[in-house]
């Protein structure tokens, strides 16, 4: 039986925009904070993927997992095409998720 909760599929990148990491979480603010601090070892931490570029919300975990799996199979150009309408300038969306001041966030992420 499926449970209804909040799940997010998201894309983060590094300061050079050279890596696109796709993940899924049930707590986007917590997970973005983990990426930004680098406290969770793994691919995203190794490549310093700390800037949130894109996210989607789902109410069912099965749908979020399916979408994450789908996006991970996409080419880089297709992922860029997905990001562009929501975030054409590739700005870090983390401050709006974390409730941070935009100016202070820019200082911390450089």
Sequence positions of predicted segments:
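GIY-YIG nuclease catalytic motif and its immediate N-terminal context
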Residues: 1-41, 45-57, 62-69, 86-88, ...
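Short arginine-rich
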Residues: 46, 69-82
């Amino acid at each position: 039986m499926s449970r209804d909760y909040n799940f997010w599929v998201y894309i983060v990148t590094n300061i050079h925009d050279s890596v696109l990491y796709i993940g899924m979480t049930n707590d986007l603010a917590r997970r973005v904070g983990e990426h930004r601090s680098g406290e969770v070892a793994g691919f995203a931490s190794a490549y310093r993927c700390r800037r949130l570029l894109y996210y989607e919300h789902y109410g069912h975990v099965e749908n979020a997992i399916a979408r994450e799996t789908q996006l991970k199979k996409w080419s880089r150009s297709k992922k860029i095409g997905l990001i562009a309408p929501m975030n054409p300038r590739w700005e870090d969306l983390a401050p709006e998720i974390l409730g941070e001041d935009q100016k202070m966030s820019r200082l911390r992420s450089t």
